[in-house]
Amino acid sequence: QEEFGAVVMMTETDWNMTDEPAIYQEYPKPIRHLSASDGSTLNLGRTRLRFMETPGHTPGVLSTRFTVYDNGYPHEAFLFGGVGLNFSGVERTEMYINSVQRLMQLEGIEVNIPNHADSGEVFDRYEMLQDRQDGDPHPFVDPESWDAWLDILKKNAQSKLEREQRAAN
């Protein structure tokens, strides 16, 4: 924000979290600008971002659904804002699993835009994109990998939940 003047948008839950003592002291507290909630939208030019609260990684994770285009053809994309399992507690892990299960119910998602580049085979897909020829499918348009990725997230979270439950007892 200091360097680029970026406007920050978060859920009220996560804005409230920023008022708590910082866990990561090396990051400055963000300046509060905009709040979003489940079902809210933001138009950027002709692109409409549709927001979904997907708690787990933080209590108020914000995820985004939007339309992308390949040679004029629309495809539904989704950015899951809280992929990481680097948190603790049974309740938060259950929240995460519930969020993943909710994402599994979404229809029509064809493009996975992960919030961390090492997730969702981003670099491999980028390399395929560099060699793409006319008529080749776009490597990021891959609805089957979206479903498979969510299955992996759920399985990993269920394993974490078992560990968290053992630690709590």
For the regions a language model picked out, list residue spans one by one.
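Active-site HxH/HxHxD metal-binding segment of metal-dependent hydrolases
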Residues: 1-41, 141-143
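C-terminal regulatory/interaction regions
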Residues: 144-169
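Metallo-beta-lactamase
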Residues: 41-43, 48-148
